[in-house]
Amino acid sequence: MLSRQTMSNWVLRVAEDWLKPVYEELHGRLLQRQVLHADETTLQVLKLEGRTARSKCYMWLYRTSGDAEHPIVLYEYQPTRKAENAAAFLEGFSGWLHADGYAGYHRLPENIRVVGCWAHLRRKFDEAVNALPKEQRVGCAALEGLEYCNALFGIEQELAGLPPEERYEQRCLLYTSPSP
């Protein structure tokens, strides 16, 4: 029977020898794109040198946009949420970064233009509407924003099955035409 340590060493060796080069190749290809998405979420780590048990760490996600012929999604573990983590990962990238409202993204170099996420904005409108008493919801600005986001998401859902070029053309027609 193999020991747990032996099996663990095998997994680490395979990751280092075989998976790391694949990850690095995908990372290089990701940085060549014009539009990326980024997000980070907490991850509880039971034991980490120099930190208390059950410390909060972060899993960062970076991915290509929906128009990519070959989508790439990469995860990066980091012990902190410092903006330097994103800056280091995105070194060499120049383009649009689609992200939530985390201030760290706005400290990235000028060649990375941060744009907001409609899903996060919609959630904030929804939270604002639900925080109001029901009688104050009708006609409030938060409800107007929520309805706008819902309409926008409806259009995007209709366009989802189209090839990227056709989606772009349809968006140009829909979003630049005057409102009725």
Model-derived features: positions:
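Conserved protein kinase catalytic core
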Residues: V45, H106, D126
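RNase H-like nuclease fold core
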Residues: R4, N9-R13, L19-A103
